Amino acid sequence: AYGGGGKGLKVVRGPDEVEAGFESATREAAAYFGRSEAYLERYLTRPRHIEIQVFADTHGNAVWLGERDCSTQRRHQKLIEESPAIGLSDEIRRAMGEAAVQVAQGCGYTNAGTVEMLYQDGEFWFLEMNTRLQVEHCVTEMVTQRDLVAEQIRVAAGEPLSFGQDDIVRTGHAIECRINAEDATRGFLPSPGRITRLRAPGGPGVRWDGGYESGDEISQYYDNLVGKLIVWAPDRGQAVRRAVRALHELQVEGIHTTIPAHLALLGHPDFGAGTHSTKWVEEDLDLTALIAAGGSAGVEAPVDDAPDALVERTVPVEVNGKRFSVRMWLPDAPVAPAAGPARARPRPTASSGSGGAGDGTVTAPMQGTIVKVLVAPGDAVEVGQAVLVLEAMKMENHINAETAGTVAEVRVAAGDTVGPGDVLAVIE
């Protein structure tokens, strides 16, 4: 009941999963938000995540500024947000906006707020209201040309809204990509470490809101959002192409990032058609295709003192709102992969990590904190069975056995901090 960001939210698909799901949800909620109350609600199988930006002042005025589609996500955490949402009828869009305003007025809310909803088969359901600006408020700013932060300050100072509902005009299309320190080829495992180089993209219609610079350390103890890449263009197709160009220009070295995943997602036919749902990334796609395309690009490669050989490359550039392909002679160095459309996932899989190399050792795939040990010496385990739960960067990761056998040794306890490669347990 308390919190957000996907924490304390568990899907239960049958009676035998209720106890474990409840225990995990309440443990996360208590750890992150200090409250462990939980509630049960209907689970929608293929919804889209649509949210409405609202504003209300102390003078009785309330408006909605359009919707954002946040359906491209993993672990209930958003990867891509865009406005307007593709495929929504004007009738549904207006109904959602008016419902969001009623929510704000019904509870006497003032200032900026985000009413989140789930949409499926022509119907929508209230999910929650975030009483603040969202990370993705930037896309609404770009399509409405309204400074929402400045408006928030004015309303907090007791001033009335500077615009009414009829003054809100939405133009063009905006897309935001959340660039996270994660390895998409390993189930979006967190990738803490030092950023050795960060170069932000530029050009018309491109905005970079970053929290790190070259040389900064990304800690395991905090959220792994490196920055937000936001683009605007007159229509959705141009916005997607502009986002792809900016992602190729963005350089983040020293850690794994979601840049290759974003390129694959933006280029996928499902995203282009707007048929994706909140389950799309985790259940329908096989992002391990990025490995063959160079999924670890962005992690700084070793270099020597010898000068790089020059090779001829075709580089996309944008000048005065127009895109060109320019042939250039550049150093023969690794570049971020184009990562074409991701392949269909052969079957749904859970977001979890495996430890060890099949020799019976269970190792930590990343730096983190052990939150729960699921086995004891003498227990029999199967291949793929969860052995421990490791928390890193606000995410719980189940560490699975890669070999069947009997647990001979458990070397850690709940609360222990471990590093990548540390042996957690031994299976014989």
Cite the ranges covered by each PLM segment.
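Short, solvent-exposed loop/turn motifs
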Residues: 62, 160, 323-325, 386, ...
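Long, low-complexity segments enriched in small/aliphatic residues
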Residues: 284-329
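Glycine-centered loop/turn motifs
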Residues: 214-216, 312, 415, 421
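Structured functional modules or segments
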Residues: 348-428
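Short, solvent-exposed beta-strand edge segments and adjacent coil->beta transition regions
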Residues: 6-7, 224-228, 312, 325, ...
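ATP-dependent carboxylate activation and anion-phosphoryl transfer catalytic cores
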Residues: 1-5, 11-302, 343-347, 352
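Short, surface-exposed, low-complexity cationic segments
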Residues: 330-345
